[in-house]
Amino acid sequence: MAGVACLGKAADADEWCDSGLGSLGPDAAAPGGPGLGAELGPGLSWAPLVFGYVTEDGDTALHLAVIHQHEPFLDFLLGFSAGTEYMDLQNDLGQTALHLAAILGETSTVEKLYAAGAGLCVAERRGHTALHLACRVGAHACARALLQPRPRRPREAPDTYLAQGPDRTPDTNHTPVALYPDSDLEKEEEESEEDWKLQLEAENYEGHTPLHVAVIHKDVEMVRLLRDAGADLDKPEPTCGRSPLHLAVEAQAADVLELLLRAGANPAARMYGGRTPLGSAMLRPNPILARLLRAHGAPEPEGEDEKSGPCSSSSDSDSGDEGDEYDDIVVHSSRSQTRLPPTPASKPLPDDPRPV
């Protein structure tokens, strides 16, 4: 990906974009820094250039600020775009800036985007919300931030370029921040409580909720976070009717299975074909799985096929070709190798690991 849009004359745009945001240094978005200060002029003539900028990959300046982890420039953009549709613009992979922040595990960026009005239930091209992605890469702190009610916005704020539209005369006598009308705030307060809860039941295009994803990835801490947030512990995935308990058994994740059982998940849940979690556990080599289920009152299987069916082998996954959606982030990001997603960026990142 290229760098960020320039903040000046259009003729200079290519040079700015080719240089990459990372080369601008930590003061790039500070008053008087490269691209700001004198170039802003008396009005907002620079705004169409910045907020209209899109790379060949569909990334906006906001996407690039997140990818390059350039917080000063991110803060600058959010000062003008918070509460507007710009927050949820999607690139060619369907990713918003919030999706990218979750993939990168950048908690502070997730918090800022969330507080600025980024949509929680926007789906990227595989149907993943930001919470799905946080579950896929094990970004616990990001998930924790997303599982909180949205922070309230300030009640007093003047108009800005994005809030008022390009046809209105900008008010240049105020600090540039987004417009939050009282009517919008009242509506926001009514919906904020439900807003963050809706993502718990959001399904990706494989029919997996964030809890399904966390269970498949054997992530005990993530499952605990989702449980505490109120996720449905018995919701089946749509392909075969597997509950989170079935998925935990198929992943042979005894610690996840125990956590779900202690939290009240139904040990008698049945797949569409009638198989119970215990029936599935008896087909696995790990004896702890069946022991845990019996200890929590799981009924003994009756009349269940002793052979693994197509569903019980975890064949349902979203491990289809996801392209190189992580490549540019990894190349341009300053993240350490230990914080990258658990599989190479050029390979698909499956929700449903194949059984050993």
UniProtKB/Swiss-Prot annotation:
Pfam families attached to this UniProt entry: Ank, Ank_2, Ank_4
Main location: cytoplasm
Ranges for the ANK repeats: 57-86, 93-122, 126-155, 206-235, 240-269, 273-302
Keyword Repeat annotated: yes
Family the UniProt entry places it in: Belongs to the NF-kappa-B inhibitor family.
Stored InterPro entries: Ankyrin_rpt, Ankyrin_rpt-contain_sf
PTM comment: Phosphorylated by RPS6KA1; followed by degradation. Interaction with NKIRAS1 and NKIRAS2 probably prevents phosphorylation.
GO biological process: cellular response to lipopolysaccharide; DNA-templated transcription; inflammatory response; regulation of canonical NF-kappaB signal transduction; signal transduction
Superkingdom assignment: Eukaryota
Subcellular location as annotated: Cytoplasm; Nucleus
Keyword Aminoacyl-tRNA synthetase tagged: no
Lineage: Eukaryota, Metazoa, Chordata, Craniata, Vertebrata
Protein name per UniProt: NF-kappa-B inhibitor beta
Gene name of the record: NFKBIB
Function of the molecule: Inhibits NF-kappa-B by complexing with and trapping it in the cytoplasm. However, the unphosphorylated form resynthesized after cell stimulation is able to bind NF-kappa-B allowing its transport to the nucleus and protecting it to further NFKBIA-dependent inactivation. Association with inhibitor kappa B-interacting NKIRAS1 and NKIRAS2 prevent its phosphorylation rendering it more resistant to degradation, explaining its slower degradation.
Species whose genome carries this gene: Homo sapiens
GO cellular component term, pick one: nucleus
